[in-house]
């Protein structure tokens, strides 16, 4: 058995697929590429494929990772070629590397992500004004997002600053704004990109519709002791 770690992308053409639909599409690619993938045992066998995260509907990813267990070693470049030849528009294998079967699961180590959040401005504004408002957030020790759960009928308060460890930056492109934000997932969980966007709109006067935003994840790492490592670097 060989465990192959792949860096892949879920481009804009697939951004509105749910995670389950995206995973199903990837399984079809693996089948069509005729790879010797391993299956679980039992009454309902399934491919031994695992993703680093479950991307939300509407979120594209220039960088995502998946592990696939193969019955035998196949040349990485051959896997890449075969999968890309059978891939739908919006999906591609970028690179790959074999890892130890004792390596930690991707979901256990992928805890730091960079996103590009984009949406239309609701008013004309200079970039330096945006940056001054963002500076207030960047220097704040606390920025609380209130998350209401209809299921429990309770409101949970999340200090977004526990998860946004680096300054958010902005770029204005015509009537649109692009925010670059890095989000850390700690023991208590993480915040969603949409929640950061909403917080900035409602509490820090960033002139955007708090509900109108598209997100693209542009990087994914394992953050350990203040250092970011690629998921290929992990043992």
Q: What do these predicted regions represent?
A:
Residues 2, 7-9, 13, 17, ...:
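Extended, well-folded interaction surfaces typified by the phenylalanyl-tRNA synthetase beta subunit core
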Residues 8, 68-74, 117-123, 181-185:
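Short beta-strand-to-loop capping motifs
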Residues 15-20, 73-78, 124-128, 187-191:
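Ordered, soluble secondary-structure elements with a strong preference for glycine-centered loop motifs
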Residues 38-70:
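Short, charge-patterned binding micro-sites
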Residues 62-116:
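Ordered, amphipathic secondary-structure segments that act as subunit-interaction surfaces
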Residues 78-87, 128-140, 196-197:
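Short amphipathic alpha-helices in soluble, non-transmembrane regions
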Residues 139-235:
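Core RNA-modification/binding signature centered on pseudouridine synthases
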């Amino acid at each position: 058995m060989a465990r192959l770690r792949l860096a892949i992308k879920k481009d804009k053409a697939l951004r509105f697929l749910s995670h389950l639909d995206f995973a199903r599409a990837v399984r079809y690619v693996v089948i069509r590429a005729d790879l010797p993938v391993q299956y679980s045992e039992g009454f309902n066998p399934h491919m031994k494929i695992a993703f680093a995260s479950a991307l939300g509907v509407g979120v594209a990813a220039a960088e995502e990772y998946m592990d696939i267990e193969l019955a035998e070693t196949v040349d990485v470049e051959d896997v890449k070629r075969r999968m890309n030849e059978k891939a739908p528009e919006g999906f591609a294998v970028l690179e790959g590397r074999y890892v130890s079967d004792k390596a930690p699961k991707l979901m256990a180590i992928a805890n730091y992500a960079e996103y590009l959040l984009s949406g239309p401005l609701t008013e004309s504004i200079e970039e330096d004004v945006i940056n001054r408002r963002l500076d207030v957030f960047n220097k704040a020790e606390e920025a609380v997002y209130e998350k209401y759960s209809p299921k429990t009928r309770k409101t949970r308060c999340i200090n977004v600053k526990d998860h946004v460890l680096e300054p958010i930056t902005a770029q204005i492109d015509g009537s649109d704004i692009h925010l670059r934000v890095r989000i850390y997932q700690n023991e208590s969980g993480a915040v969603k990109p949409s929640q950061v966007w909403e917080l900035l709109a409602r509490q820090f006067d960033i002139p955007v519709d708090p509900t109108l935003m598209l997100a693209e994840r542009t990087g994914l790492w394992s953050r350990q002791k203040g250092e970011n490592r690629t998921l290929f670097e992990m043992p």
